[in-house]
UniProtKB/Swiss-Prot annotation:
It catalyses: 5-methylaminomethyl-2-thiouridine(34) in tRNA + selenophosphate + (2E)-geranyl diphosphate + H2O + H(+) = 5-methylaminomethyl-2-selenouridine(34) in tRNA + (2E)-thiogeraniol + phosphate + diphosphate; 5-methylaminomethyl-2-thiouridine(34) in tRNA + (2E)-geranyl diphosphate = 5-methylaminomethyl-S-(2E)-geranyl-thiouridine(34) in tRNA + diphosphate; 5-methylaminomethyl-S-(2E)-geranyl-thiouridine(34) in tRNA + selenophosphate + H(+) = 5-methylaminomethyl-2-(Se-phospho)selenouridine(34) in tRNA + (2E)-thiogeraniol; 5-methylaminomethyl-2-(Se-phospho)selenouridine(34) in tRNA + H2O = 5-methylaminomethyl-2-selenouridine(34) in tRNA + phosphate. Its EC number is 2.9.1.3. This is tRNA 2-selenouridine synthase. The keyword Lyase does not apply. Keywords: Selenium, Transferase. The lineage of its organism: Bacteria, Pseudomonadati, Pseudomonadota, Gammaproteobacteria, Enterobacterales.
Length: 364
C-alpha cells in the first residue's frame, strides 16, 4: 500500500480506471463523481447534515463525536462489511472522500483494524476533479475538426469510427435533439465533465494525436453543457459537412428512433410497459418543440403520430411514422440546422456524402 500512497499521479489514476471506493454521502456523489467510482458512504445524507449542523454550532470535536455516535454498532459493522467486500473485489482500489480528510482516514483506519491496507486519494474527489478540469482545458487546445450535417446524416457513427473521435453524445447519454434521450439517465454536469476528461486523456494516450474529431454540437447536449474551454474551440473549428440523400437519412432515423428505441424500451420494461414508455417518449419529443412548431401544427403532427403508433402496434410497420417525420424535418430540423450552419459557412472545409467524408478523413 505504501507505494500506492506516495506521490500520487492523479492523471495516471484516472487513465488506469482506478477503482474508487467513494465514501462521501449519496447527495455529494450524485452531484459529481469519477467514472467507475462506487458510492459506499461513511454517512448517509441525513447523518452528514446533522454532523454539519453540529460543526457549525459546537465545533469540530463535537461534530466528530456525533459522527461516531451516528455510525456505530450494527450500522458501523454493515458499512465496514461493504467496504471490505469492495476492497476484496477491487484490491487495486482507493478510498476517496471530498478532500482526503477525516472520512476517508476513518474508513482507512477501520479497515486497517481488520487487516486491510487500502490507500486513499490525497486531496480526495476535489483533487481528481481539478485534474479533470485542467486536462480538458489542456487537451482542448489541440486542433479540432467537426463533423456536421442535418439530422439523420450518420454523424455520430462517423465520429465513432475515427481513432481520434470523441462521441460527445455517447458521453452525455443524449442525442442532442428533443427526441435525444436514451434509456440511461444523463449524468450530473460534473460527472459528465469528468467522464469527458477521462475519455480525452485515454484517446490522447493511445496515439500521437494530431486533432480531435467531434460532432458539430450546440452549447448543450440534453441537460449537459459542454465545458466552456471546449465549446470556444469548437466555435472556431473547421467543419466537414455530410450531405446524404433525404431518403437515406429517413432510413437511418427509422432504424434509430422507431425500431431500435422500440426494441430497447420493450427489452427493458416488457412488451406492454415498454410500448407505453416508447409511445410516451415520442410524444414527449414532439411536445418539447410544440411552441416552435405552432400549436396547430403540433396538434396535426400529434394526430399523425398517434395513427403511426396504432399502425406499428397492430402490424409492426414503421412506415406510418414517415407521415410526421418528413414534415418535421422539412419544416423544423433541417431549416434550423441550415441556419446554424450558414453562420459558420466560413469554417466549412469539405462537403460530401457520408462515404465521401469518411474517405476524406482517411486521407487527412
Amino acid at each position: 500500500m505504501q507505494d500506492r500512497q506516495k506521490a500520487q499521479d492523479y492523471r495516471a489514476l484516472l487513465l488506469a480506471d482506478t477503482p474508487l471506493i467513494d465514501v462521501r454521502a449519496p447527495i455529494e456523489f450524485e452531484q459529481g463523481a469519477m467514472p467507475g467510482a462506487i458510492n459506499l458512504p461513511l454517512m448517509m445524507d441525513d447523518e452528514r447534515a446533522a454532523v454539519g449542523t453540529c460543526y457549525k454550532r459546537q465545533g469540530a470535536d463535537a461534530a466528530l463525536a456525533l459522527g461516531h455516535r451516528l455510525v456505530c454498532g450494527d450500522i458501523r459493522q454493515q458499512r465496514l462489511e461493504a467496504w471490505k467486500a469492495a476492497y476484496q473485489r477491487f484490491p487495486n482500489g482507493y478510498l476517496c472522500c471530498a478532500r482526503g480528510g477525516q472520512r476517508s482516514h476513518i474508513v482507512q483506519r477501520w479497515l486497517q483494524e481488520t487487516g486491510i491496507d487500502c490507500p486513499l486519494i490525497e486531496g480526495g474527489y476535489k483533487a481528481l476533479r481539478q485534474t479533470a478540469i485542467q486536462a480538458t482545458w489542456q487537451l482542448a487546445q489541440k486542433p479540432i475538426l467537426l463533423i456536421g450535417g442535418c439530422t439523420g446524416s450518420g454523424k455520430t457513427q462517423l465520429v465513432r469510427q475515427q481513432p481520434n473521435g470523441v462521441d460527445l453524445e455517447g458521453l452525455a447519454r443524449h442525442r442532442g435533439s428533443s427526441f435525444g434521450r436514451t434509456l440511461n439517465p444523463q449524468l450530473s454536469q460534473a460527472s459528465f465533465e469528468n467522464k469527458l476528461a477521462v475519455e480525452l486523456l485515454k484517446i490522447n494516450a493511445r496515439q500521437t494525436l494530431k486533432r480531435w474529431v467531434l460532432e458539430d454540437e450546440g452549447r448543450t447536449i440534453g441537460a449537459n453543457h459542454l465545458p466552456e474551454c471546449l465549446r470556444e474551440r469548437m466555435a472556431q473549428a473547421p467543419i466537414a459537412v455530410v450531405e446524404d440523400p433525404f431518403a437515406l437519412r429517413l432510413e437511418r432515423l427509422r432504424e434509430e428512433y422507431f425500431i431500435r428505441m422500440h426494441h430497447d424500451f420493450t427489452h427493458a420494461y416488457g412488451d406492454e410497459a415498454g410500448w407505453q414508455a416508447y409511445s410516451e417518449y415520442l410524444h414527449h419529443g414532439l411536445f418539447a418543440i410544440r411552441r416552435r412548431l405552432g400549436l396547430q401544427r403540433f396538434a396535426e403532427l400529434t394526430d399523425t403520430l398517434d395513427r403511426a403508433l396504432a399502425e406499428q402496434l397492430s402490424s409492426g410497420s414503421t412506415d406510418g411514422h414517415m407521415a410526421w417525420l418528413v414534415p418535421l424535418l422539412n419544416e423544423y430540423y433541417d431549416p434550423m440546422y441550415r441556419y446554424q450552419l450558414e453562420k459558420k459557412a466560413a469554417n466549412i472545409v469539405f462537403r460530401g456524402t457520408w462515404q465521401d467524408v469518411a474517405n476524406w478523413l482517411k486521407a487527412q
